[in-house]
Regions:
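N-terminal functional module of multi-domain proteins
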Residues: 44-130
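Long, hydrophobic, well-ordered secondary-structure blocks that form the structural core
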Residues: 118, 129-155
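Internal helix-turn-beta structural module
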Residues: 285, 301-329
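Short hydrophobic alpha-helical runs that function as membrane-insertion/retention elements
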Residues: 118-123, 145-147, 232-233, 287-289
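Flexible, glycine/proline-enriched loop segments at strand-loop-helix junctions
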Residues: 95, 120-122, 144-151, 184-189
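N-terminal charge/polar-biased segments
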Residues: 1-9, 327-339
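An N-cap/entry alpha-helix motif that binds or orients negatively charged groups
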Residues: 2-80
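Alpha/beta enzyme core
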Residues: 110, 138-139, 151-266, 273-296, ...
Length: 339
């Protein structure tokens, strides 16, 4: 199946909220939660996508003609390209009843591994969600990053014990998850964390720890102070706070501040290999992509993941070659027009 055929098939089964748009840009689903949309009037999601599109790349083909290498070492695991499936949860609430969270992860995690990347897995108020994710990760050699919500410390410890048994190569927390409307006043309680609390969580993890939901230099420095080995520059796809900057806008300053000291990932509106290139040029080491993987799996299961990863890789390779970059280390900010 082609990418377009998979998108069309997904429209028949992805549920009442997501429209499986040809371009996933937040316009058709703004202010749709439950669903794939963003909080408030939806500008967070829309701005995320638009700001990547506003960036232009500098073409330069007066360079050596040799193969392009997109491989990336991620906490000791080599991946084929610096792209990861973002953590998603409560699928039946947001995307219809075709897949439970467990069924989705049972397709996503091995399909990502087979195609040379890795998946971050999601969390939710139902404890079976993380239990299922841990089981899938264990069955696939720990090839993935379980992502825990910022619950109270007792619940975090329970979930850390659960996922550590799966031996993942890293563990994450989407610390901005407390802003999700459907988590408000829920049990277990979720909320922000101090540097001291985060330091305690990092120590309990006993794995490289990634803090997802960083949008300022100050936040990045606090994550570093707490001992995190990586961050994800992210506004949760616009789902936790409306009218904030896009991840593309804040990424360069954050990368300049902490990029030499920790791994920097970014998400939010990244859809193509060209977008991946732009993110790397602005200082990211890798990217997370969320909503499009939903459509690929709902449209064609594991085949959808394969088609999308191959599309991203081909687009990234083409952009690198046309800009004179033959490895990820060759990608420089000067390859973005105006920088």
């Amino acid at each position: 199946m082609t990418y377009q055929e998979i998108q069309a098939k997904a429209r028949d089964c992805v549920g009442p909220y997501c429209k499986s748009c040809p371009v996933c840009n937040g316009l058709a689903c703004k202010n749709t939660i439950p669903g794939p949309g963003a909080k408030g009037i939806g500008t967070g999601f829309i701005r995320n996508y638009q700001k990547w599109q506003e960036l232009c790349v500098n073409m330069d083909t007066i360079c050596e003609n040799k193969p392009v290498d997109t491989s990336f070492d991620f906490f000791g695991r080599k991946v084929a390209l610096p792209v990861f499936a973002a953590p998603l949860g409560a699928l039946t609430l947001h995307y219809g009843d075709k897949y439970s969270d467990l069924a989705y992860n049972e397709i996503l995690v091995p399909a990502c591994a087979e195609n040379g990347i890795a998946a971050f897995t999601g969390d939710g108020t139902n404890p079976t969600l993380m239990q299922g994710a841990a089981q899938v990760l264990a069955k696939n050699g720990g090839c993935g990053v379980p992502t825990i919500k910022p619950w109270n410390m007792e619940t975090i410890k329970e979930k850390l014990d659960l996922v550590k048994a799966a031996d993942p190569f890293a563990i994450a927390m989407d610390i901005d998850g407390a802003g999700l409307p459907f988590l408000k006043n829920m049990t277990p309680p979720a909320g922000s964390k101090t540097v001291e609390e985060l330091r305690e969580i990092v120590a309990m993890a006993e794995k490289p720890f990634i803090v997802k939901g960083i949008m300022t230099v100050a936040g990045a420095k606090k994550a570093l102070e707490a001992g995190a080995k990586g961050i994800v520059v992210s506004n949760h796809g616009g789902r936790v706070l409306d009218q904030c900057p896009s991840s593309a806008e804040v990424l360069p300053a954050i990368a300049d501040a902490v990029g030499s000291k920790m791994t920097i990932l970014v998400d939010g509106g990244i859809r193509s290999g060209m977008d991946v290139f732009k993110a790397l040029a602005l200082g990211a080491d890798g990217v997370l992509i969320g909503r499009p993987f939903i459509n690929m799996i709902y449209g064609a299961g594991a085949e959808g993941v394969k088609v999308y990863v191959e599309k991203l890789k081909a687009e990234l390779e083409d952009t690198m070659a046309m800009c004179g970059a033959h490895s990820l280390a060759d990608i420089k900010r000067s390859m973005i027009y105006g920088y």
